Regions:
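Conserved catalytic or regulatory cores that recognize and/or transform ribose-phosphate-containing ligands
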Residues: 1-140
């Protein structure tokens, strides 16, 4: 069985079912929404409610806030722990960065596309794409 880092978005409606189905299939799964160290994951607004409107300098400073440092370390530990990344679309910058890190580390990356997005050629950098949960689980 695989140790899986599921990379996605807080707003992704498919994420909870993906985590559940992967666990039911016997895989170990890192769930950033419910991290093993407790808490409810990381939100920039936990540092500052005005974070969405920050200047670049405020953002750069925020990267060194203890909450940001703690969550970054937890996510990086999880990336190192995992042998596989499942990138669940639709998602944004962080999830794509995480998937790219995993691929660069020589780890398997599968893109799960439950609803067709604009075609992306560079997903060929990864190990495969899956259009259904059954296909995803069979691929793993």
């Amino acid at each position: 069985m695989a140790r899986i880092y599921v990379a996605s978005s807080w707003r992704n409606q498919y994420f909870p079912e993906v985590v559940t189905r992967l666990r039911e299939a016997g895989h170990e799964v890192y769930d950033f929404r419910n991290p093993p160290h407790g808490g409810a994951g990381f939100h920039w607004t936990d540092i500052d409610p005005a974070a969405p409107g920050w200047t670049f300098d405020q953002y750069r400073e925020g990267l060194h806030h203890p909450l940001a440092e703690r969550q970054f370390a937890a996510d990086l530990d999880a990336l190192r722990w995992a042998d596989t990344c499942v990138l669940v679309l639709p998602c944004g910058r962080s999830a794509h960065t995480e998937a790219g890190w995993m691929a660069g580390a020589g780890k398997r990356v599968i893109v799960y596309i439950p609803e067709m997005q604009e075609p992306e050629l560079m997903y060929k950098l990864f190990d495969g794409v899956a259009g259904t949960l059954d296909e995803l689980i069979a691929t793993l």
